[in-house]
C-alpha cells in the first residue's frame, strides 16, 4: 500500500484471508482496498462477511454502512451506523473509519437530493465525532448549507425545537437518540409524548424535523402543518408553515410547470425579420458564459439571435406593467432563441422559461412570427416548477437596467400598493390585506411575505415587502422572535429582526449564521449596526462581515466604485490594524476599478482616475500580496493584463473613442441580479431544489 501497489496488496490480503478468515485487521484492509479499486459489489460482500464474523466491530459496522448506502439501502445503513456508534461508545474509542462512514452516508444523501437529511448526518458527525476536524466533513457541511438552490428554511442546522420546561425531559431523550443516529426511536418517543399532550406545537415541529431527516416528506409536512395550526400567533408556526409548503411542492398555490418550447421555422428569412421588428422583443446582449450555457439547448450550436420576450410592447411597456402589478403577471413570459443558418437541420425557434399559464400567449406570439401559420411544435419539455410571483419579481430586474435606482423607487412604491391586493389560492376569496385581519389566515400572510424576502433578499424587494409587513401589522414580539432564532439557530427569520435591538453577542451570532449559510444580502441588513459597534465586537467576525459586504458593493455599486472605494479602504485599514487577512478586500477593490475601466458609460476623467488608483493598488499587491494564498494568483493575472488595458486606454483616448466593455468574467445564474447586464429569463437553468431532487 505504501508503494502505491494496491492491486498487489488486495491480492495478498485475499490470499491470507483464504488461509485464515478469522482476522479482523485483514478484513478491514480488504474492505478498504475493495473500495479503492472501485469494486462496489466485491466491497459489499467483504463488508457483509466482515460484519458477520465480527458483529461488534465498529470498523466492520462502518464498512457495512458504507456498502449499504452505496447500494441505496439507506435505512439499513442508518441502523449499521447506529450500532457502530454504540460499539464505539462501549469501547471508549472512535475510529477514523467510523467518521468516514458517517460522512459517506451524508454525501450519498446530498447526491440523492435529500439535503435536510444530509445536513443532519453531517452536522452530527462534525459536531459529535469529528470536533477536531480530522476529516473534510466540516467543509462538506458548510458547502451544502450554503447551496443557493435549496430553500434556506430546509438547509438550516438541526435542532429539536424542544425548549419549553415541560418538554425538557423529552428533549433529553430525543437528543440522545439523535446523537446515535436513532431517528426512528426519537420519532417514537415524540409520538408517545403527543399521545398525552397532543396540543404542544414544539413537539409537532420536532416530529416534523425527525421525519424530514428520515426522508419521510409527506409525514414531515403533516407534522409541520399541525404545528402551524396550534401556533397561530408565534414565529414557530410561521416556520412550520414555510417548511410544509416547500415539502408539499405547492408553495402558496402559485407553482407552475416551466417549459422549454421548440418550434420549426418554415420561412427563416421572414421569421427573422418578424422577430427583429416585434415590439414585444428586445435583443439580449450575452456574455461568453451565458452563450456557453445556451449551447446545451441545441447541441453545441449557439443561437443566431437571442431576445427577451416582454409581455408589454415597447416603448410604454413599463408603465403598463406597473398599472397591472397587482395582477401578478410575469413581465418576461419567455426567452427566445433563434437558430437559423448555423444549423444543418430546419431553422427553429426555442422559447425557454415559459410558465404553463403563459403558454397560450407565447404560442400566439410564435404564430405571429411565422406569418400567421399554425406553429409546428417539435418539443415541449417541463424543465422545472416555478413560483409565478417569484418569477414576476425576478423579471423586474430586466427592465431596471442600466439605471435601476430611478425606476426601482417607482416600482417599490407600486409594490407597496399592490401586494396587499394580491390573492393566493389558500386564502381565496380574500386578499392578503383581508386575510391579515383573519386570525385563522394571518400566519399564511406572514409566511408568504417572509418567503418572498427569503427567496428574493435584495433590498429592492425586501424593502417594499417589509413595508407591507408593517402596514398589515404582522410583527411578532421582539423577544419572542429573538428567542426562537437563538434557540433554533434558524436564519429564516432574519428578515424580521431589528438589528438595533440585538445584544452584541446575538448580533454576531446572527451574522455568523447568515454568513455560514451564504446569505450575503440578508447579512448586509446587519452591517450598519456592526459598523456602529465594531470597536467592541470580535474583530475576526467584523472582518468576515466586511468581506461579505464588499462583495455586495462590488456586485451592485461597481458603476459608482470611486465613491464606494473609501468605504472599502476603511475596511482594509481596520483589518490591517487588527492583523486580519484582507487580501479579498484588495481583490474586490481591484475588480471594481477594472469594471470602471471596462465600462461603456464611465467618462474619460473617471477612467483616468480609476487607472491611477489601479496602478497604485497593483504595485501594493505585487509588493505585499504576491505570496498571499488568497489572491496571489489573481494579482499575477491582473498585473499581466494591466499593461494591455493601459495601452487600450491610450489608443482609444487618442482616437476620441470609448473602450468597449468586455464580457463580465463572472458566472451567470438566473437568480444573480446585475445592474450592468439583464438576466436571461431562464429560471430552469438553475432549478429550485425540491425534496428528493438534485
What are these regions (language model features)?
Residues 3-4, 37, 71, 112, ...:
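Structural motif corresponding to the intra-repeat A-B loop/turn of tetratricopeptide repeats
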Residues 9, 43, 77, 118, ...:
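Single-residue signature of alpha-solenoid repeat helices
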Residues 34, 68, 109, 177, ...:
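Residue at a conserved register position within TPR or TPR-like alpha-solenoid repeats
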Residues 241-331:
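Short Lys/Arg-enriched alpha/beta "domain-start" segment
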Residues 15-19, 50-53, 86-96, 131-135, ...:
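Flexible helix-coil transition and linker loops at the boundaries of alpha-helical arrays
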